[in-house]
């Protein structure tokens, strides 16, 4: 499964960013192959529409699930129709969150 995880940094010990639209980085992780792509969020400094634009970025990257601390209703309205599962209330290091996802410990909204 292809995950989009919000992160505060671009290293394996980075914490999950509690913000979706204005997170610093997105980690795109393939849970099958283990491949990872780290993207600096181009929408983080936008004055408006960051959530929608970040959601559109996740759709364009073909992610199947988004893992974040919080997400706004506008971003959800982009992700949900695209069939992307949303996991909120996520905390901890990105690498730990990937392991928790793989073990089935996370619940969708």
Show where each model-derived region lies.
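Conserved SAM-binding loop
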Residues: 67-68, 86
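Short secondary-structure boundary segments
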Residues: 7-9, 69-70, 90-91
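C-terminal structural segments of small proteins and small subunits
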Residues: 73-109
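Domain-level signature for proteins that mediate thiol-based redox and metal-cofactor handling
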Residues: 7, 12-14, 65, 80, ...
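N-terminal first-folded block
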Residues: 2-43
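Compact, glycine-rich, soluble single-domain proteins
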Residues: 39-64
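Internal alpha/beta domain cores that form substrate/cofactor-binding pockets in large enzymes
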Residues: 29-32, 36-45, 77-86, 90
């Amino acid at each position: 499964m292809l995950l989009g995880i919000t992160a505060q940094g671009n290293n394996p010990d980075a914490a999950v960013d509690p913000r979706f639209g204005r997170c610093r980085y997105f980690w795109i992780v393939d849970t099958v192959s283990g491949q990872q792509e780290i993207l600096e969020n181009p929408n983080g400094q936008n004055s408006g529409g960051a959530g929608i634009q970040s959601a559109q970025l996740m759709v364009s990257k073909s992610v199947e699930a988004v893992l974040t601390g919080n997400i706004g209703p506008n971003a959800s309205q982009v992700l949900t129709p695209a069939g992307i599962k949303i996991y909120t209330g996520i905390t901890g290091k990105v690498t730990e969150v990937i392991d928790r996802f793989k073990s089935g410990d996370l619940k969708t909204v």
